[in-house]
Amino acid sequence: MATTTTESITTADRRRRGGAATGLQAGRRDGRRKPRVDPLFLAFLLPTLVLFTLAITLPAVMGIVLSFTNSVGFGEFRFTALTNYIAVFSDPAILQAYLFTLGFSLVTVIVVNAIAFLLAIALTSKIRGKIALRAVFVLPMVISGIVIAYVFSFLFANSLPAFATAIGFGPLEQSILANPDLAWLAIVVVTAWQAIPSTLLIYIAGVLSIPGEVYEAAALDGASAWRQLVSITAPLTAGYILINLVIGFKNFLNSYDIIVGLTDGGPGTSTTSVAMSIFKGFNGGDYAYQMANATIFFVIAVVIAVIQLRATRGKAAL
């Protein structure tokens, strides 16, 4: 009887093992099986992909190809190898535009993120009327950049000099837009004024995502407001900071409308950005030359973005 029972247990155990092995093999087969793509997903994706290819990818590729030619935008052309690229790197005006654009973008992204981060902390604290204040601070988002530029241009050219004259402040008695050494500061101020609201909204979302219990525990441990900012708020919003830095720097590299409305690249060429030089070059008939300039600018922007992401990889996560 004992022998029969033992054989039954052994047989059942083998069956269980065989079933497990069969299931494992089936799982392995399922694991090797390629995932099926939902046809509905493809149906929604395909139109967007086609439009993106026709509107973005194809023109970009054609522009890169034409940058190696002497094309004027129409008619016949011939390939000129690296002639346009050599001309771009040897053009002092283009190099000046790159230096201005990079310097302006760096200063502006620091100013915008510093102010927006501090405002986000203030507007998520226990103060009265913070909802109304948030609405006020995001108003510049709905105003066109060129309109903002024209309004500030009037202020810098008329109101500010008049006020400086009234109080006897000599350095601002003349319009700073006419000063080659100070005009860039006006562009930074106006660009920051328009860019802070969108950056602020992202920071508010980041600060509100931090559980209140974390601050309560820190307060019980005797952490000061500064210590909570440095040890809790900043680290836990690092992902949002990264997003704002990358997106902001990219947007400032492409600045155009505010610069046109304020200085139109002047005085002289002291505030001419790369985007402005490319646009003016197209209007002047330097089609292939500015295509080379645009290609170089695109590569620089991508390299900067990759460096930013790699430098912060593993340190920030939403």
Stretch-by-stretch model annotation:
Residues V37-L318:
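A structural signal for multi-pass alpha-helical bundles of membrane permease subunits
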